[in-house]
Amino acid sequence: MEKAILIRFGDLVLKGKNKPKFIGQIKKNIRSKLKNVNVEYTFQHDRIYVHFNEVDSDEVIKQLGYVSGIHSFSYIYKTTKDIESIAQLAKEVIQKEVKLPTTFKIETKRTDKNYPLKSLEISQKVASLVLPSFDGLKVEVRNPETVLDIELRSEGTYIYVGKIPALGGFPIGLGGKGLVMLSGGIDSPVAAHLMMKQGIDVELFHFESTPLTPLESVQKVIEIAKKLAYYTPYNKIKLHLVPFTKIHEAILSYVADPYIITIMRRMFYRLGEIYANQHGLDTLINGESVGQVASQTLSSIKVIENVTSIPILRPVITYDKNDIINISKKIDTYDISILPFNDCCSIYVPRNPVTKPTIDQALKEESRFEFKELLEDALKNVQTMIITPTTDFEIALHGFDVKDALSSYTQE
């Protein structure tokens, strides 16, 4: 029997006149993800059939699981429109795909309106031919454990059992570009993933304070980027490493203890906005969730984002921590994020961080040191890596800080 994968689109059905553009982008992204697998495609309106060798089945499903814009997919089998042929294929599919005993229902969709039988009649006829062959099948119309779907179309009949959930959302490439302020923690990788799922093409922006912080903290971010790269159409993602050490030292030296995190994050936002504007990125993205820490109260968020005018997206802003953790486990970043290596946000935590900062006091704290030249110097020395899922780079083996390590690595 002829086997393929049926791909169904997700939120694309909502896009009206823009729908062809979105479908074109998702076709492009699917082709890119499956370029190393021997497959063929059949494109029909709002669905895609992927034809493949059985030996590649697991790899095809794995790669499709990384493509945003797909709502679900199913293993699907094709035959003619002859009732006897449909019933015979249904038996073979049940033997192959269904675990018995189970309650059972056949649902038919008939798009070929010239076919002599109506949808319900097709279901009844096929059921009468199939059920005698299986002792473990019991008809249950209202709430069956198993549904056998029959789609009778002009070119033939398709049969499948069940749907494999996919990412949903929109295809990357049509939603603009964003700069993710990526720490080594749990939240920001999830924020990056959620934005990618919604079609945003992201780059990663990490503030590193080596040697104040260990190189292992940067290694964490590299490993997280490798996981996120799976969800891009071309299996690669840009990671920008921003040298924050001098700014960090100045903040620790001059800023009052309760305001250290507030001022540090204001510097993050300034750097992110300048870099985004210089490189054609439309928005900043972060992993802030209201009230989780002192710097994420509404008062703190208001004061911190006061230094920017660029849009700031916070996809996990209302998520519970457990919800964020569950997503991080699903995208395989959780075990990396909890590794015990401090970054610049966690290396020094004030005893009593301010939870209701004011803009006036923040400006007063910033007036204690000259930070503009420090920001300019940091931006001039950003180190950019192109990360893929197979990037093999142990940063601690190449130097004592990021600049030395990357310089040594590129010379090898």
From Swiss-Prot:
Catalyses which reaction(s): [ThiI sulfur-carrier protein]-S-sulfanyl-L-cysteine + a uridine in tRNA + 2 reduced [2Fe-2S]-[ferredoxin] + ATP + H(+) = [ThiI sulfur-carrier protein]-L-cysteine + a 4-thiouridine in tRNA + 2 oxidized [2Fe-2S]-[ferredoxin] + AMP + diphosphate; [ThiS sulfur-carrier protein]-C-terminal Gly-Gly-AMP + S-sulfanyl-L-cysteinyl-[cysteine desulfurase] + AH2 = [ThiS sulfur-carrier protein]-C-terminal-Gly-aminoethanethioate + L-cysteinyl-[cysteine desulfurase] + A + AMP + 2 H(+)
Positions annotated to bind ATP: 181-182, 206-207, 265, 287, 296
Cysteine pairs bridged by disulfides in the record: none
GO biological process: thiamine biosynthetic process; thiamine diphosphate biosynthetic process; thiazole biosynthetic process; tRNA 4-thiouridine biosynthesis
Domain THUMP intervals: 58-163
Its EC number(s): 2.8.1.4
Function according to Swiss-Prot or TrEMBL: Catalyzes the ATP-dependent transfer of a sulfur to tRNA to produce 4-thiouridine in position 8 of tRNAs, which functions as a near-UV photosensor. Also catalyzes the transfer of sulfur to the sulfur carrier protein ThiS, forming ThiS-thiocarboxylate. This is a step in the synthesis of thiazole, in the thiamine biosynthesis pathway. The sulfur is donated as persulfide by IscS.
Record's protein name: Probable tRNA sulfurtransferase
Annotated source species: Acholeplasma laidlawii (strain PG-8A)
